[in-house]
Amino acid sequence: MIKKIFLGTLLTGLILSGIYLNNLGQRPDREYPSFTLHPETKATTVHDSIPLQDVVLAGNNWDGVITIFDPNTFKIIKKVSAMPDREERFEEIYSGLRSLASGFIREYIGEGNDQLVDDMFTSNDGRYIYVSRPSFADVVAIDVNSGEIVWRTPIEGLRSDHSAISPDGKTFLVSASTARKVQAIDVSTGEIIGSFESGDQPHENIYSEDGKKIYHASIGKVFFASPNLDFLKGDRWFQIVDANTYEVIRRVDMKQKLEEAGFDWIDRAVRPMAITKDEKFAYLQISLFHGFFEYDIENDKITRKLDLPIPKTNKNLTPGDHILASGHHGISLSGDDKTICIAGTMDGYIAIVDRETFKYSIIKLSDDPKEAKPYWATSSKDGTKAYVSISGLDKVSVVDYVTAKVVAEVPVGNHPQRVRNGQLRLKY
């Protein structure tokens, strides 16, 4: 009898596992916004007499659309599809064994959604947008006027992630999430020209102001949330990299630095970060932490921390309740490096913090802290405002650093994440 029960349970488990894996690898039946291509307006027809105009880009990760808006009027100028090749790409990622990996990324990283535009930057000449597309594991150059893909570069592994562009606009960095490396792409050709080693799930990339260094962090396997599973999360490093040779200059286990400073915390993964212009200090968001830490780059030590408020309804949050192990995900510095903007992801607010005193103001975004889900913060080109993507409400909030007030809200697409400044030549 016991043997029959065991075999029956095993058979049931195998059947249920088979059904689960089959469903996991199925492409969702979902509609996405459609855009008409305009090859007659491709880059070669866009004369230099058409002036470059300042723009802000918001990447809407769950519908594959880039919203372009004016940084002065905050009016939407244009929307561009980040995936004019979507049928070909979806057929590719939902075929064979690749479909299981794609389903895992969709369900456990994308919260049930394919990830279609993570990060993007404009080209120097204003004719192209370079886009990291996580679920497609690639980077593409999109002609902003025609909507066509000019080049496509698959990256190593199964998922692309956070990116950066060099100050001279010639090199696009992209984290290859499952390949433990960051790859460098020549934007003129789409050719991969270099790479450097990272830890598990390479994530954030920031160039120094002079373009000589890259600040990078890997976040580990964030789908293992519990501190009891820390041994499964893998290597989580903060790195400083030579931007010319791609040699790792410094590699830091931030858990060690936290302990040395007397700050005992349950994780070590550096999430979004902000670097002062003189490169003396970095402000680091750490997995599961609701606040941030100040890291003295010159002396290689943690110097301060700021605990930001946790709403009453969030007091009993477990590590598993956090979205991809993020307490807060999004941090920026004002142009004068005096003020910090925080996207309080799990807590449903934006915090504006005086860098010297750590005094702060809170901007509440929703009654339910989990509804708004602010996900990124970027300073405006002039450094006076912060753009914060409110991913749960499909908008970008514009915050004045001095007054700590929201001065505008821009409706964008489905689940905005990265927000970037740029310049484009748009043919009307």
Stretches with model-predicted labels:
Residues G13-Y428:
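Predominantly soluble domains enriched in secretory-pathway, periplasmic, or organellar proteins
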Residues M1-L10:
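N-terminal Sec-pathway targeting helices
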